């Protein structure tokens, strides 16, 4: 707070000196424009007052400039100090990265990770070969199809000894020319009936073999 008040007082005195120098300078120029002689006490007094205010103003300006330069340099130094402090704090917080052996440890970790990645890739490859394999032909593999067929066979109904489908078993219905009950009727055949075999002597087996001729009485 005292520093701010001192700076405000310096600025106020500088402003007052600048205003006083301008007033005395204008009075001197006004007397000169009016044709007052430089030997006139009025001119001499105004000129000396203006000169004194001018010298004071220059001194205060130079002082203000020096102070401002010092303030700027102090600000630069402060910034540099703050930067160094921040760098020191950062390095202190990460001092483990400053270990000379850190590079070797990082290389060792990279090698170990690479080996583990290769092991994982090999395990994934083996799992793919052992598993379902390529699913381009569908999600069921040949082994899956065989397993499904086995399930179908084992779940099929068994044939009993007296079952209707066993060879030689008695039918469960009365045979009819049209087949079992519920079966569709056989279609009518369009083939003409075969002629009855002739009953003449030419077709008699006994006559043809001469048996009747040799044994006329059937003996």
UniProtKB/Swiss-Prot annotation:
Ranges in a coiled coil: none
Domain of life: Viruses
Pfam families: Herpes_UL14 (PF03580)
Post-translational modification summary for this protein: Phosphorylated.
Keyword Transit peptide in annotation: no
Main location: virion
Keywords: Host cytoplasm, Host nucleus, Phosphoprotein, Virion, Virion tegument
Gene Ontology CC: host cell cytoplasm; host cell nucleus; viral tegument
Localization per Swiss-Prot or TrEMBL: Virion tegument; Host cytoplasm; Host nucleus
Comp. bias (Pro residues): 177-200
Spans annotated as Disordered: 161-219
InterPro entries: Herpes_UL14 (IPR005207)
Effect of residue 201 to A: In strain: Nonneuroinvasive mutant HF10
Family, similarity comment: Belongs to the alphaherpesvirinae HHV-1 UL14 protein family.
Assembly, per entry: Interacts with UL51.
Biological role: Contributes to the nuclear transport of the viral transcriptional activator VP16 during the early phase of infection. Therefore, participates indirectly in the regulation of the immediate-early gene expression. Additionally, seems to be important for efficient nuclear targeting of capsids. The UL51-UL14 complex regulates final viral envelopment for efficient viral replication.
Protein name stated in the entry: Tegument protein UL14
Organism: Human herpesvirus 1 (strain 17) (HHV-1)
Organism ancestry: Viruses, Duplodnaviria, Heunggongvirae, Peploviricota, Herviviricetes
